[in-house]
């Protein structure tokens, strides 16, 4: 009888452990679709048996990732995750490149279902200032010349997080996305900070060999000093941090903000197997709690 009771207890415990494994949602980057995240999906499923992983694609993938506004992409992302009953009790969230901004904006604006751990792979968190970026010549030319024209802001997703350190006033006046989700406007959105500080963990990574995200340290919210295209100001030395506009200082001081670097090139995340150790060391631990 005792053996039977112990067996039943072990089975119940195993079921509880499986059910306690939080689902994971993936959000791809610009100029790609969800197929680019399939290797990461496989790594997760191999590492955590029976886990549910949702690999989200916005619209038709590559085309819509460029020519759909960021707000529309975020709304579609929210609709997809909110319609999935397997995510109703919350999930962990991984974004890559532009997808890191879509994912973070979901946390700040919705956070329903709740996101527990947010993991940013090589994202332009502090902004983007450098071409070639999308490797479409006319798009890169527009980014380098007229990114803040109203029609461009409403037509090109990548223009919405273009941050020209030589034209900060124009950026703050015309940016319809990044200046908003980074809480850079004079009137702060308190909901953004409230939702972001509910995270158990925020994980930020950038690649020391990244030639796509410029500056590469933007993955850590670091960015060029106003008026400079060379001097990079670390997050902790920015007003963003000292005044805690988004809650990043709150997360940091409560040991919930984590910083990592990789050596894979931008496009090798998350495709090439030689990048897998970074997944194992810097991502997997945050999918198991």
UniProtKB/Swiss-Prot annotation:
Name where it's found.
Answer: Lysosome
A Gene Ontology molecular function term for this protein is: palmitoyl-(protein) hydrolase activity
Protein's UniProt keywords contain Membrane: no
- The active site of this protein is located at 97, 210, 266
Superkingdom of origin organism: Eukaryota
Q: EC annotation?
A: 3.1.2.22
Name the InterPro entries for this protein.
AB_hydrolase_fold
Q: Write down the chemical reaction(s) this protein catalyses.
A: S-hexadecanoyl-L-cysteinyl-[protein] + H2O = L-cysteinyl-[protein] + hexadecanoate + H(+)
Cellular component aspect of the GO annotation: lysosome
Q: Which residues are glycosylated?
A: 189, 195, 281
Top EC class of this enzyme? hydrolase
Location (main, coarse): other
Position of the signal peptide: 1-20
* Keyword annotations from UniProtKB, A to Z: Glycoprotein, Hydrolase, Lysosome, Signal
Per the similarity annotation, which family is this? Belongs to the palmitoyl-protein thioesterase family.
Its function?
Removes thioester-linked fatty acyl groups such as palmitate from modified cysteine residues in proteins or peptides during lysosomal degradation.
Tell me what this protein is called.
Answer: Palmitoyl-protein thioesterase 3
Q: Which organism is it from?
A: Dictyostelium discoideum
Q: Gene encoding this chain?
A: ppt3
């Amino acid at each position: 009888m005792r053996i039977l009771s112990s067996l039943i207890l072990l089975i119940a415990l195993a079921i509880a452990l499986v059910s306690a494994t939080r689902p994971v949602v993936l959000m791809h980057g610009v100029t790609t679709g969800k197929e680019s995240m399939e290797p990461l999906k496989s790594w997760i499923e191999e590492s955590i048996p029976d886990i549910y992983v949702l690999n989200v694609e916005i619209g038709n993938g590559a085309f819509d990732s460029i020519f759909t506004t960021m707000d529309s992409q975020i709304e579609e992302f929210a609709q997809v995750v909110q319609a999935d009953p397997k995510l109703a009790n919350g999930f962990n969230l991984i974004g890559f490149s532009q997808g890191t901004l879509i994912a973070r904006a979901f946390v700040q604006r919705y956070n329903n279902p709740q996101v527990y751990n947010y993991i940013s792979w090589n994202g332009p968190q502090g902004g983007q200032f450098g071409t070639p970026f999308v490797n479409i010549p006319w798009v890169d030319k527009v980014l380098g010349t007229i990114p803040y024209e109203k029609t461009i802001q409403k037509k090109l997703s990548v223009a919405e997080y273009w941050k020209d350190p030589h034209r900060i006033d124009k950026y703050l006046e015309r940016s319809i996305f990044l200046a908003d989700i980074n809480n850079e406007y004079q009137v702060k959105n308190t909901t953004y900070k409230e939702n972001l500080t509910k995270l158990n963990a925020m994980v930020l990574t950038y690649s020391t060999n990244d030639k796509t995200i410029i500056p590469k340290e933007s993955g850590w919210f670091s960015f060029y000093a106003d008026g400079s295209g060379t001097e990079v100001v670390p997050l902790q030395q920015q007003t963003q941090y000292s005044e805690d506009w988004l809650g990043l200082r709150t997360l940091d001081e409560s040991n919930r903000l984590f910083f990592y670097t990789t050596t894979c090139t931008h496009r090798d995340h998350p495709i090439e197997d030689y990048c897998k150790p970074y997944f194992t060391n810097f991502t997997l631990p945050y999918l198991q709690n």
